[in-house]
Amino acid sequence: LKFKAPGSLSPLHGIPILLKDNIATKDKLNTTAGSFALLGSVVPRDAGVVTKLRKAGAIMLGKATLSEWCHFRTCESPNGWSAIGGQGKMSVIVLEY
């Protein structure tokens, strides 16, 4: 554990973050935009938003799936379909009253 004076921690210190798979990270997290075409590709640097998140103390836990090519390639594939992650599901629980 790290102990620092109150107010000396960065704004997002230790906050876990999931990034969509189209946001570049220069680490072991693939940036594929949901496509096999980019599997294993290496980006030269973190995206600007990732640099700012890391500087603010956020912890990148992983990548969240998205429709292949951000659903740009076709209107025929089902919403949420990704070659890497399959069909996306809702990430919330719907309660019935």
What are these language model-derived features?
Residues 1-97:
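Gly/Ser-rich catalytic/binding loops embedded in alpha/beta enzyme cores
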